[in-house]
Protein backbone atom coordinates (compact mmCIF):
# COMPACT_ATOMS: atom_id res chain seq x y z
CA UNK A 1 0.00 0.00 0.00
CA UNK A 2 1.11 3.54 -0.81
CA UNK A 3 0.16 6.11 1.84
CA UNK A 4 0.16 9.82 0.96
CA UNK A 5 -0.42 12.60 3.45
CA UNK A 6 -2.06 15.38 1.48
CA UNK A 7 -2.07 17.77 4.43
CA UNK A 8 -4.04 18.45 7.62
CA UNK A 9 -6.03 15.20 8.22
CA UNK A 10 -6.35 14.20 4.56
CA UNK A 11 -4.75 10.88 3.62
CA UNK A 12 -4.83 8.88 0.39
CA UNK A 13 -4.33 5.10 0.56
CA UNK A 14 -3.41 3.58 -2.79
CA UNK A 15 -3.37 -0.15 -3.46
CA UNK A 16 -5.69 -2.26 -5.56
CA UNK A 17 -8.18 0.55 -4.77
CA UNK A 18 -7.82 4.18 -3.69
CA UNK A 19 -9.26 5.36 -0.38
CA UNK A 20 -9.36 9.06 0.47
CA UNK A 21 -9.91 10.00 4.10
CA UNK A 22 -11.16 13.47 5.14
CA UNK A 23 -10.95 15.16 1.72
CA UNK A 24 -9.84 18.63 2.81
CA UNK A 25 -6.55 20.35 2.12
CA UNK A 26 -5.96 24.00 3.05
CA UNK A 27 -4.64 24.93 -0.40
CA UNK A 28 -5.51 23.36 -3.73
CA UNK A 29 -7.94 20.53 -4.36
CA UNK A 30 -8.19 16.78 -3.90
CA UNK A 31 -10.21 16.39 -7.12
CA UNK A 32 -7.29 14.80 -8.97
CA UNK A 33 -6.98 11.93 -6.50
CA UNK A 34 -9.90 10.08 -8.15
CA UNK A 35 -10.66 7.82 -5.16
CA UNK A 36 -12.73 4.67 -5.29
CA UNK A 37 -13.98 5.36 -1.76
CA UNK A 38 -14.11 8.45 0.45
CA UNK A 39 -14.26 8.24 4.25
CA UNK A 40 -15.38 11.26 6.28
CA UNK A 41 -14.70 11.22 10.02
CA UNK A 42 -17.08 14.08 10.89
CA UNK A 43 -18.91 17.10 9.55
CA UNK A 44 -16.48 19.95 10.28
CA UNK A 45 -15.36 21.84 7.18
CA UNK A 46 -11.71 20.84 7.55
CA UNK A 47 -12.65 17.16 7.30
CA UNK A 48 -15.72 16.95 5.08
CA UNK A 49 -13.92 19.23 2.66
CA UNK A 50 -14.73 18.37 -0.95
CA UNK A 51 -16.90 15.33 -0.23
CA UNK A 52 -19.93 16.99 -1.82
CA UNK A 53 -18.18 18.07 -5.02
CA UNK A 54 -16.28 14.78 -5.43
CA UNK A 55 -19.53 12.81 -5.43
CA UNK A 56 -17.66 9.53 -5.02
CA UNK A 57 -18.88 6.55 -3.00
CA UNK A 58 -18.58 7.81 0.56
CA UNK A 59 -18.84 6.31 4.03
CA UNK A 60 -19.73 8.37 7.09
CA UNK A 61 -21.75 8.09 10.27
CA UNK A 62 -25.47 7.82 9.53
CA UNK A 63 -26.58 11.41 10.10
CA UNK A 64 -23.73 12.81 8.03
CA UNK A 65 -24.31 10.22 5.31
CA UNK A 66 -27.93 11.34 5.01
CA UNK A 67 -26.83 14.96 4.65
CA UNK A 68 -24.41 13.94 1.89
CA UNK A 69 -27.09 11.87 0.16
CA UNK A 70 -29.32 14.96 0.07
CA UNK A 71 -26.47 16.73 -1.73
CA UNK A 72 -26.31 14.02 -4.38
CA UNK A 73 -23.40 12.06 -2.93
CA UNK A 74 -23.64 8.24 -3.09
CA UNK A 75 -23.04 7.96 0.64
CA UNK A 76 -23.45 4.95 2.87
CA UNK A 77 -24.10 5.32 6.57
CA UNK A 78 -22.66 3.22 9.37
CA UNK A 79 -22.04 3.64 13.06
CA UNK A 80 -19.35 3.20 15.66
CA UNK A 81 -18.34 -0.42 16.13
CA UNK A 82 -19.67 -1.46 12.73
CA UNK A 83 -17.76 -2.83 9.75
CA UNK A 84 -18.61 -2.66 6.07
CA UNK A 85 -16.95 -4.08 2.96
CA UNK A 86 -16.68 -2.03 -0.21
CA UNK A 87 -14.93 -3.54 -3.22
CA UNK A 88 -12.45 -5.50 -1.15
CA UNK A 89 -11.86 -2.66 1.32
CA UNK A 90 -12.86 -3.40 4.91
CA UNK A 91 -13.84 -0.33 6.92
CA UNK A 92 -14.52 -0.32 10.66
CA UNK A 93 -15.78 2.81 12.39
CA UNK A 94 -14.17 3.56 15.74
CA UNK A 95 -14.98 6.07 18.50
CA UNK A 96 -13.53 9.56 18.61
CA UNK A 97 -13.85 12.15 21.37
CA UNK A 98 -14.87 15.24 19.43
CA UNK A 99 -17.92 17.11 18.16
CA UNK A 100 -19.45 17.01 14.69
CA UNK A 101 -21.42 19.82 13.10
CA UNK A 102 -22.09 20.72 9.48
CA UNK A 103 -20.83 24.14 8.41
CA UNK A 104 -23.63 24.81 5.94
CA UNK A 105 -26.19 27.58 6.56
CA UNK A 106 -28.82 25.52 4.76
CA UNK A 107 -28.15 22.41 6.80
CA UNK A 108 -26.34 23.51 9.91
CA UNK A 109 -26.61 21.38 12.97
CA UNK A 110 -25.62 18.01 14.31
CA UNK A 111 -23.93 15.56 11.99
CA UNK A 112 -23.97 12.62 14.37
CA UNK A 113 -20.85 11.98 16.39
CA UNK A 114 -17.25 12.17 15.29
CA UNK A 115 -15.48 8.91 14.48
CA UNK A 116 -12.26 7.31 13.37
CA UNK A 117 -11.69 4.51 10.86
CA UNK A 118 -9.76 1.27 10.67
CA UNK A 119 -9.12 0.47 7.00
CA UNK A 120 -7.91 -2.95 5.85
CA UNK A 121 -6.78 -3.39 2.26
CA UNK A 122 -4.13 -5.50 0.53
CA UNK A 123 -2.93 -7.04 3.80
CA UNK A 124 -2.33 -3.66 5.47
CA UNK A 125 -4.30 -2.19 8.38
CA UNK A 126 -4.41 1.59 8.87
CA UNK A 127 -6.03 3.40 11.80
CA UNK A 128 -7.05 7.02 11.17
CA UNK A 129 -8.07 8.42 14.55
CA UNK A 130 -9.95 11.42 13.15
CA UNK A 131 -10.19 14.42 15.46
CA UNK A 132 -10.06 13.06 18.97
CA UNK A 133 -8.85 13.39 22.49
CA UNK A 134 -7.07 10.54 24.20
CA UNK A 135 -9.27 7.69 25.43
CA UNK A 136 -8.32 4.42 27.08
CA UNK A 137 -10.26 2.23 24.63
CA UNK A 138 -7.56 2.99 22.07
CA UNK A 139 -5.97 -0.04 23.71
CA UNK A 140 -8.86 -2.14 22.38
CA UNK A 141 -8.35 -0.77 18.87
CA UNK A 142 -4.79 -2.05 19.07
CA UNK A 143 -5.81 -5.41 20.52
CA UNK A 144 -8.67 -6.01 18.09
CA UNK A 145 -7.26 -4.76 14.79
CA UNK A 146 -3.46 -4.66 15.24
CA UNK A 147 -2.98 -1.67 12.92
CA UNK A 148 0.28 -1.40 11.03
CA UNK A 149 -0.04 2.39 10.90
CA UNK A 150 -1.65 4.88 13.27
CA UNK A 151 -2.51 8.35 11.97
CA UNK A 152 -2.84 10.52 15.08
CA UNK A 153 -3.72 14.21 15.53
CA UNK A 154 -1.15 16.14 17.55
CA UNK A 155 -2.20 19.78 17.15
CA UNK A 156 -3.79 20.24 20.57
CA UNK A 157 -6.61 22.70 21.34
CA UNK A 158 -9.22 20.84 19.26
CA UNK A 159 -7.63 17.37 19.53
CA UNK A 160 -4.90 15.58 21.41
CA UNK A 161 -1.59 17.34 21.73
CA UNK A 162 1.80 15.66 21.52
CA UNK A 163 1.78 14.49 25.16
CA UNK A 164 -1.56 12.71 24.80
CA UNK A 165 -0.70 11.38 21.34
CA UNK A 166 2.41 9.74 22.78
CA UNK A 167 0.21 7.77 25.16
CA UNK A 168 -2.24 6.99 22.36
CA UNK A 169 0.56 5.62 20.19
CA UNK A 170 1.60 3.25 22.97
CA UNK A 171 -2.00 2.19 23.63
CA UNK A 172 -2.48 1.34 19.94
CA UNK A 173 0.90 -0.27 19.38
CA UNK A 174 1.17 0.36 15.63
CA UNK A 175 4.83 0.15 14.64
CA UNK A 176 4.43 3.14 12.33
CA UNK A 177 2.99 6.40 13.65
CA UNK A 178 2.24 9.38 11.42
CA UNK A 179 1.16 12.68 13.01
CA UNK A 180 -1.67 14.61 11.35
CA UNK A 181 -3.87 17.65 12.08
CA UNK A 182 -1.07 20.01 13.12
CA UNK A 183 0.60 23.22 11.88
CA UNK A 184 -2.20 23.93 9.40
CA UNK A 185 -2.98 27.06 11.42
CA UNK A 186 -1.27 28.77 14.33
CA UNK A 187 -3.86 27.51 16.81
CA UNK A 188 -2.83 23.91 16.13
CA UNK A 189 0.93 24.43 15.97
CA UNK A 190 2.88 21.46 17.31
CA UNK A 191 6.48 20.28 17.61
CA UNK A 192 6.37 17.18 15.43
CA UNK A 193 10.13 16.67 15.64
CA UNK A 194 9.96 16.66 19.43
CA UNK A 195 7.07 14.20 19.25
CA UNK A 196 9.12 11.89 17.03
CA UNK A 197 12.20 12.11 19.26
CA UNK A 198 10.27 11.44 22.47
CA UNK A 199 8.46 8.38 21.11
CA UNK A 200 11.49 6.82 19.44
CA UNK A 201 13.64 7.30 22.55
CA UNK A 202 11.16 5.62 24.87
CA UNK A 203 9.47 2.95 22.69
CA UNK A 204 10.14 0.65 19.75
CA UNK A 205 7.67 2.60 17.59
CA UNK A 206 8.74 4.63 14.57
CA UNK A 207 7.36 8.08 13.75
CA UNK A 208 7.37 9.26 10.14
CA UNK A 209 7.01 12.97 9.48
CA UNK A 210 5.54 13.46 6.02
CA UNK A 211 5.22 16.81 4.33
CA UNK A 212 2.04 17.63 2.41
CA UNK A 213 2.00 15.47 -0.71
CA UNK A 214 4.72 13.12 0.55
CA UNK A 215 4.24 9.36 0.55
CA UNK A 216 5.56 6.16 2.02
CA UNK A 217 5.06 2.49 1.23
CA UNK A 218 3.48 0.22 3.83
CA UNK A 219 4.31 -3.46 3.22
CA UNK A 220 1.62 -6.06 3.91
CA UNK A 221 1.80 -7.73 7.30
CA UNK A 222 -1.03 -10.23 6.79
Curated annotation (Swiss-Prot):
The keyword Transmembrane does not apply. One of its GO terms (molecular function) is hydrolase activity. The keyword Hydrolase applies. InterPro entries: Metallo-B-lactamas, RibonucZ/Hydroxyglut_hydro, UPF0173, UPF0173_UPF0282_UlaG_hydrolase. It comes from the Archaea. Keywords: Hydrolase. Gene3D superfamilies: Ribonuclease Z/Hydroxyacylglutathione hydrolase-like. Belongs to the UPF0173 family. This is UPF0173 metal-dependent hydrolase Mboo_0816. It comes from Methanoregula boonei (strain DSM 21154 / JCM 14090 / 6A8).
Amino acid sequence: MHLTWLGHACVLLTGTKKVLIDPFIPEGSVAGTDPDLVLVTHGHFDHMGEAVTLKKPTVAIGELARYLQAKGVPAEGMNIGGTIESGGIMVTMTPALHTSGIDDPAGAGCAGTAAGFVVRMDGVCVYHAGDTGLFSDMKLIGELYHPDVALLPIGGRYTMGTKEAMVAAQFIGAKTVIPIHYNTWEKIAADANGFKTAIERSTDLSVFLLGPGESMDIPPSR
